Structure formats: C-alpha cells, structure tokens
Amino acid sequence: MTSETVDPPQLNTIRIEVDGEIGTLTLDRPDAFNAMSPEMIGELTVAFAWLADRAPLRALIVTGAGRAFCAGGDVTWFRKGVEEEGIDLPSEVRRGAEVLHQAIVDLRRIPYPVIAAVNGPAAGAGFSLALACDFRIASSTAFFAPAYGRIGASPDGGMTYFLPRVVGPSRALELLLEDPNLKAEEARALGLVSEVVGADELM
C-alpha cells in the first residue's frame, strides 16, 4: 500500500470521500435506487482497487445515496438495451457478472475493515455487496432481499459464497428459495447485521 496523498478517482456513479483514516464509498444513482448499471459495476473495480492501496486508511464505509443501499442489477437498463439497442442479453449479463465478481474480489483484498452502512433496500447484487463487507450496520428502514429467484436467475456477486458463511448453509438455502424481504430487525436476528440504528444515526 502507498502512503502518498492522492485524490480519489472522479467517477460518474460512485463517490469516494476520505476523512482522515476513514474512507466512504457511496453508490450514487439515487434516482435508480443505486441499481448497478454496467458503468457502476466497472467503476466499483476502479474504486475498490484504489481504496486497497491507501495506507493511511483504517476503515471503509460502503453506503448508498438517497433512500436505498442498492436495488441490485439495473433491470431497467438491460430491458432498454434489449428493446432499443438489440443487445445480446445473455452475453451482457455474463459480462456484467464477471466484472462484478472482480469487484467483489477487489473489495475482499482491502486490508482494513469494510463496513456496509445499509441505509435502505439491499436487493440482489446489492445484498451480495453488503454480504461481501466485513460486517453490516443497518438503518431501521433497511431491508434485505435475495431477489434472484424473482427474475429466474441464480445468485451472483458472491452471495452463494458469503450467505452460508454468515447464516449457515440450511438457513441460506431457505432464504434463497423463499426469497423474503427481510426487515432490519429480522436480519439482525439471523446475524446478517451487527446493529440496527435509526435512519438519522446511521451516518
């Protein structure tokens, strides 16, 4: 890691702020509930790689702008791409998943604690991103949803790796099959979050 002072990269869908030894990464597509577009997924790899190389930092907070943590993959973007641009959906989804998986690997390489401050819905890939953090603190307005079954997809973003390690294999399978919306207190009871706080106390 380098200890030199370098300004964070300027990205379109993500904000990185550094305050002393604490970094904050904010998913910044509030109008889309911070859903992951291909651009955001690519920028996550840039952001996490930069953060992993910052020696002065001692902790990183990952959160979302507005009312959501992250609504998962941007299904609206994919639908529009198919209808208006004729993209090959299976190929685009596969490519996006590969980049997302690299972003999760880059996140796990960060050599200091990463805390997910879950300020609202964390669904699909957003749930996966929260699980990939070292631990999670949730707003009382947050909820967690696997969501993949609702679109006929298998979980990605590391969910099948992290979820069984957090809640146990049997409960993880139950959550993936039943696909509930877990309220913050329910998530705490399962061990998914360490603490639930008021919305005005989270950040």
Predicted segments with their positions:
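Residues at the N-termini of beta-strands
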Residues: 24, 59, 68, 135, ...
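Conserved CoA-thioester-binding segment of acyl-CoA-metabolizing enzymes
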Residues: 1-65, 105
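Hydrophobic alpha-helical membrane-association signature
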Residues: 40-43, 96-99, 202
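Glycine- (often His-adjacent) and acidic-residue-rich active-site loop
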Residues: 64-103, 122, 150-152
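Crotonase-fold acyl-CoA enzyme core
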Residues: 105-203
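Hydrophobic/aromatic residues within transmembrane alpha-helices
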Residues: 25, 62, 74, 129-130, ...
